[in-house]
Each structure stands twice: as C-alpha cells, then as structure tokens.
Amino acid sequence: MNDTVLVLNGPNLNLLGKRQPEIYGRETLADVEALCRETAAGFGLAVDFRQSNAEHALIDAIHEFRVGSAGIVINAGAYTHTSVALLDALNTCEVPVIECHISNVHRREAFRHHSYISLAATSVLAGFGTHGYALAIRHLAHLRAGRPA
C-alpha cells in the first residue's frame, strides 16, 4: 500500500471562498489543499489533491486510486446527490473512502439530504467546515493503524 491519499473535489469547489461564503466560508481551495498536505504530512502521508467540474475526470481519479492508495477523501459537491456513476466507481474501491462536506447538508435543502456517495463511503463528515478535510485525513491514518472505523 502506498502512502498517498487522494483528496477529490467536485463541481464548483474551485470557487470556494467566493461562492456563497455564508455557507462555505472564506477559505479557498488552495487553503484546503495546504491544510490537507500539512495534516497528511503529520501522519507520514502524501496528498494528491484534485478538483474537477467534470464527472468523468472524478471517475478517472477514483479508478486511479481505488487500489493500493492510503484512501480517498471525496467532496463530490452537487454530484453527491445525483451521480450513480460516481457511486459505481466508488463501489470498486478496495481502500477506505471518506465522504466530506463543508456544510451540514442535512440542515439545507431537502434534495441535499440524499447522498449516493454515502452508499460507498466508509465514513461521512458534514458540517465541520474545511476542518472536515483534516478530520478525514486523520481518520484515514487511524484506519491505516489498524483501528476499526
């Protein structure tokens, strides 16, 4: 198993810090990437940090990391609620998958309450702000140490 965590971000997360800051905060995706790299380094892990607005690019990344990586942290954005294709890709994973949402999706619009991603996720984090990414990486390190989910 290699020591790289895939941190995968879906549509519109490239606008983090600019789009609806009252919901998502003012931190940018670059800030989140720095947080992820710093957190992972503390556990001897590396991060491959990606964002795409294209569903096929997210699927390709999942396929690339589904076996042999340290795990996947995914914030699929709006695809969380719509993408059976992402679910199918995640169901092929032999590594832990942590679903991460900046906002508490369960306190928002009803259509956001359903997640296809959760059906394949080892664990789910929502509503912790961007700190949720660090918690997700810590949890992957916890799982790698042989502790149960």
UniProtKB/Swiss-Prot annotation:
Q: In which pathway does it act?
A: Metabolic intermediate biosynthesis; chorismate biosynthesis; chorismate from D-erythrose 4-phosphate and phosphoenolpyruvate: step 3/7
Quote the EC number. 4.2.1.10
Name the cystine pairs: none
The record's section on InterPro entries has: DHquinase_II, DHquinase_II_CS, DHquinase_II_sf
Gene Ontology molecular function: 3-dehydroquinate dehydratase activity
Q: What class of enzyme is it?
A: lyase
| Active-site residues from the entry | Y24, H101
Classification via PROSITE patterns = DEHYDROQUINASE_II
* Annotated Pfam families: DHquinase_II
Q: Which reaction does it catalyse?
A: 3-dehydroquinate = 3-dehydroshikimate + H2O
Which terms are listed as keywords in the entry?
Amino-acid biosynthesis, Aromatic amino acid biosynthesis, Lyase
Record GO biological process: amino acid biosynthetic process; aromatic amino acid family biosynthetic process; chorismate biosynthetic process; quinate catabolic process
The UniProt entry's sequence similarity note says: Belongs to the type-II 3-dehydroquinase family.
Q: What does this protein do?
A: Catalyzes a trans-dehydration via an enolate intermediate.
List the HAMAP family hit by this protein, alphabetically: AroQ
**Summary of subunit composition and partner proteins:** Homododecamer.
Q: Which named protein is this?
A: 3-dehydroquinate dehydratase
State the species of origin: Methylobacterium radiotolerans (strain ATCC 27329 / DSM 1819 / JCM 2831 / NBRC 15690 / NCIMB 10815 / 0-1)
